[in-house]
Regions:
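Predominantly cytoplasmic-facing regulatory/coupling regions of multi-pass membrane proteins
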Residues: 1-90, 147-248, 274, 279-281, ...
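Generic beta-strand or strand-like secondary-structure segments
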Residues: 71, 75, 90-93, 108, ...
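Membrane-interface alpha-helices at helix entry/exit sites of multi-pass transporters
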Residues: 83-87, 101, 106, 116-132, ...
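Membrane-embedded alpha-helical segments of transport systems
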Residues: 91, 95-99, 122-143, 246, ...
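Transmembrane alpha-helix interface/packing and boundary motifs in multi-pass membrane proteins
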Residues: 92-100, 241-260
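Re-entrant/interfacial helical elements at transmembrane boundaries that shape
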Residues: 103-115, 144, 253-268, 282
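Internal, well-ordered alpha-helical segments in soluble enzyme and binding-protein domains
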Residues: 109, 119, 128-135, 139, ...
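Interfacial segments of multi-pass membrane proteins
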Residues: 112-122, 239, 243, 261-276
């Protein structure tokens, strides 16, 4: 069926509205789970210097994440303006953090990039490279921190210290294998479900790891600042890495409850009080999740309203 066929246009409109409705429903469900009175109290009473420093790092983190899609722009060779790429990346990341990868990482990317004129095959490559970049940095940092034994696990936890070290070594081996393939593989093209992917150069792979690692470290620094710098920074970073993979396994939007459970289990007691941890994580959620999500929602509506004009401009430039 041709894309200009009336039935296709009708189906596209229906799918678009279903997507909008799904996003609104998820936002409402998420908002109901948040104790907004407690959130406001924590922010109002927080140390201003720590709060402002954390805000600055949040901006830095979102800008760094935008570089994932700029790397993908170079990788795919598409000609969308860099500012458009950064805007789409910001919107997708904010929705991804709060409403899951399916909504933010995949659904929103396909919606916005297609509205701006990119074909589905290119969008698939952008998403694939972006998610690969994100997890390469995670794997590298987690491999180093877990192998070094920075994270002290409590007795009778889900895994012991030895298992975590073995996991760390395994993660570093994944990094080594990826770099080897990027540097020496003779067959650099592969097709997955009809999508052609090209293995990047080893220099490009290093850029992926560097940018993503810095972003994860900035995220760790935000929580460390909000904890009042009372705990070793690398320990906080290690706990964040543990909680992130736990959040992926449990698959709860925004990792509600998972982040708090892991941090209180690994930090509470001799390191810092449970109340301080919960307050810091609440502040972190407000700064890194809630406020960017509200801004992303506004940006999304503005981008949707300008999409036709931008698409025409992009197609003329291409």
């Amino acid at each position: 069926m041709s894309k200009s066929h009336p039935r296709w246009r009708l189906a596209k409109k229906i799918l678009t509205w279903l997507f909008f409705i799904a996003v609104i429903v998820l936002l409402v469900v998420y908002a109901k789970k948040v104790d907004w009175e407690e959130v406001w109290k924590v922010i109002r009473d927080y140390n201003r210097v720590a709060l402002l420093s954390a805000v600055g790092l949040v901006v830095v983190s979102y800008l760094i994440y935008g570089c994932y899609d700029l790397l993908a722009r170079f990788y795919c060779g598409h000609k969308l303006a860099k500012r458009q790429v950064m805007l789409v990346s910001f919107i997708c990341y904010a929705f991804n953090l709060t409403l899951s990868t399916w909504v933010g990482g995949i659904g929103m990317r396909y919606r916005l990039y297609s509205r701006l004129g990119l074909p589905g095959s290119t969008i698939t490559r952008i998403f694939s490279l972006s998610i690969t970049t994100n997890w390469l940095g995670y794997i590298l940092l987690a491999g180093i921190i877990f192998t070094a034994g920075v994270v002290e696990l409590p007795d009778h936890w889900y895994v012991d210290q030895t298992t975590l070290r073995i996991l760390g070594i395994g993660l570093l081996m994944i990094i080594a294998v990826y770099l080897w393939f990027c540097a020496f593989a003779k067959h650099r093209h592969m097709t997955i479900k009809g999508q052609k992917l090209v293995l990047p150069s080893w220099k490009f792979a290093l850029a992926q790891m560097l940018i993503s690692s810095v972003n994860w470290m900035v995220m760790g620094a935000i929580i460390w600042l909000l904890l009042g710098q009372s705990v070793n920074y690398f320990f906080v970073l290690g706990v964040l890495l543990v909680s992130s993979i736990a959040g992926v396994i449990v698959h709860i939007p925004a990792g509600i409850g998972v982040l708090e459970a892991v941090f209180t289990a690994l930090l509470a007691g001799e390191h810092t009080s449970k109340g301080s941890i919960i307050a810091a994580l609440l502040a972190y959620r407000v700064l890194y999740y809630f406020i960017p999500l509200l801004l992303a929602l506004i940006c999304y509506l503005l981008l949707e309203s300008q999409a036709k004009k931008l698409r025409a401009k992009n197609e003329a430039a291409m």
